[in-house]
Amino acid sequence: MLKTFGVAGAALGVGSVLSNPLLGASHSKPSGKNNSNPWIYAFNIGDVEAWSISDGFLDIRAGLSIMYPESERGQMKQLLEQHSEQTDSLHMYINILVLRRDKEVIVFDAGFGIVDNPNRGWLIEGLETIGIKRADVTAAFLSHTHGDHIAGFIAPDETPMFPNAAIYTTPEEHKFWMQTSHDFSRTKRDPNALVRLVEAAQMRLELLKGQIEHTPAGTKLFGGLVTVEDAFGHSPGHAMYRIESAGESLLNITDIAHNDLIMFRNPSWVIGWDHDMGQAVDTRRRVFKQAAQQKTPVFGFHVPWPGLGSIVPRGSGESYDWAPRRLFWA
């Protein structure tokens, strides 16, 4: 069994404190990144340098109304209250995994891009902080085409954010969004929002067509450093990634979980944004069970920054805890 990754890094914080008019009353405090709130964490996976860079966060004011089954929202609310979490909105982190090996620089998803919002769009500044320019990025992975993952691949002038990078995505994901008809019968998304989602996905994929390469599940790249794995459900071709180097590993579960309490405690609790809710639940059960049994170190896109941890079983059933990894400063 591959052992846990080594941590040899530091947390960094820079920038100003700005307010966000979109936040609810419970979030009226100044927000944004600052020196008292670290947003870059350095570690390593075997021989590979790695960073978790926060691209910011979202507060979903719809709260538990986007979680299903509707009949079990009371249990979800009770769980949040037990952990002193707010119940009128859901806080989602945006964690970007970055790897560097020699001249290879690899980014996993790209966040929101450069936007006029103090609470998101931090990735490019984060890369510059650790000495990586946009042109230095040689490869990137697009787990799926939702805006918080794909928008950051496009600069404000509609040119590639990372002009020298190949962008790897599954053929299932690319084909679904670029086709002329779409089956959304297994999602709870608002139909009007789906129209905008398709338009945005097609526009962005068209702009990136010169960089996109199809990588089916099972594809190994960079001499086995990264393996693309099937995580279908949240989107038609949703992918996750296994990183392996010098006997150490990390599983990037991308959007399999959107909350570190709700979806781990009961993997059948599902967010209405999932494309195929039943398939998303099956994927989550499979991945959580395997990761827990194998004690695999995990990286999550939406769990609390820096997104590093492990999945720990609760008893003998299908219930788990998200166990954040201890942070180290070298």
Each model region followed by its residue ranges:
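C-terminal segment of N-terminal export signals and the immediately downstream linker at the start
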Residues: 17-52
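Cap/insert and terminal regions of metallo-dependent hydrolase folds
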Residues: 242, 246-330
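Conserved beta-strand hairpin/beta-sheet module of binuclear metal-dependent hydrolase folds
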Residues: 39-130, 240-256
